[in-house]
Amino acid sequence: GLNVDFRNREILRDEAEEGVIPLFYSQHIRQGKVEFPIRKEHEYVVTEQKGLMQDNKNYLFVKHFTAKEEPRRLQCGVYLAKKFPQYQKISTQNKINFVDGVLTEMSEYLVYGLYVLFNSTLYDEYYRILNGSTQVNSTEINAMPVPDLEDIQEMGRKVLKSKDYSEANCNLILEGYCG
């Protein structure tokens, strides 16, 4: 995420007001989706600082920290720009990693396909081998092997069609591509 909130207290807002943009925290990631607002303090920021804003486009948000006792290390949520059409820009708190299309915008299918990968048992276990800590770093996320884009998009189509975003269903979908 781009925003270290405790270093930018003067721009934080609790309520939606003129000129604010949403500030997403890891608490907004719930059961594979990004929910906003959740009546948390400091859910908005007022800023023109480019380094604190990002385009409102499709992302996969991944929690940066997880508790040791949590069953999964990779905990992610699908962020779709179309759910927040009133904003051109958003901000993410630094305890969120975000996956985006650097060269092109990610389609809804692609974001959901990435969700299938990151929400699967295989990827969670692989990540634990790469990194034994409870911290999820972008370096390791970027180092993880992924299928080609067409396969990822097809996985996204399948999970959307099924409307079942569970780990078990993600595992079933992924098995169809990895054996």
Where on the chain are the PLM-derived regions?
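Polybasic, glycine- and aromatic-enriched phosphate-binding surface used to engage nucleic acids
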Residues: 1-164, 168-174, 178
